[in-house]
Amino acid sequence: MKTLIYSILILIGALSVAACANDVLPKPKGGLRLDYPQAAYSRVTDLPNCPFTFEANTLSAIEHKANSCDVNINYPTMKATIYLTYKNVDGNIRKLLTDAQNFTYKHTVKADNIAATTFVNDTTKVYGMFYQVYGNAASQSQFYATDSVKHFISGSIYFNVEPNYDSVQPASNYLQKDMRRIMETLRWK
């Protein structure tokens, strides 16, 4: 009987020792998953004395600066804003284009890359460039659009957080689609 008890105790002890082994397992890579609602757009026409209209995401809040045609498109849930700045073209198109391009390329200090895409819509006479900025730059996307004769508008995305590319990338990708939509739906009055 004693040997049976000793055998059971030895078996329990061996199982206890074997069960306490900590196998180190690699943790699977995880990524930040943020799901944003499907974008719905409506035409922004209530900008007094401004010679343009465009479509904006219905999730945004439009803030129009009095006595100017500057527009802030706020996204409170993402802590982001698309800033639109309008200028009249008065024989200064070259300066406006140079300023917009220089403004974008000032981000090269922090940016890993800047990809430029040409935008042309002959039907609506909207011509411009869209810039996607990669890396920890302050602005992840910028654009300008013009008719080359009377109108010039520029836009940029800024987040109200420290520019950590990995953290803002999901929201930035969502807002880049909105920014492209602004360019595509821009109409001069």
Regions found by a protein language model. Give the residues of each.
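Bacterial N-terminal signal peptides that target proteins for export
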Residues: 1-8
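Post-signal peptide N-terminal segment of mature Sec-exported envelope proteins
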Residues: 28-49
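Second-shell loop/turn segments in exported
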Residues: 82-91, 142, 165-173
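Surface-exposed amphipathic alpha-helical segments
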Residues: 156-189
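C-terminal motif of bacterial Sec signal peptides marking the signal peptidase cleavage site
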Residues: 15-19
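Secretory pathway targeting signatures of secreted, lumenal, and periplasmic proteins
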Residues: 48-102
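Bacterial signal peptide processing site
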Residues: 21-25
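Signature of long, low-cysteine stretches enriched in small and polar/charged residues
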Residues: 101-156
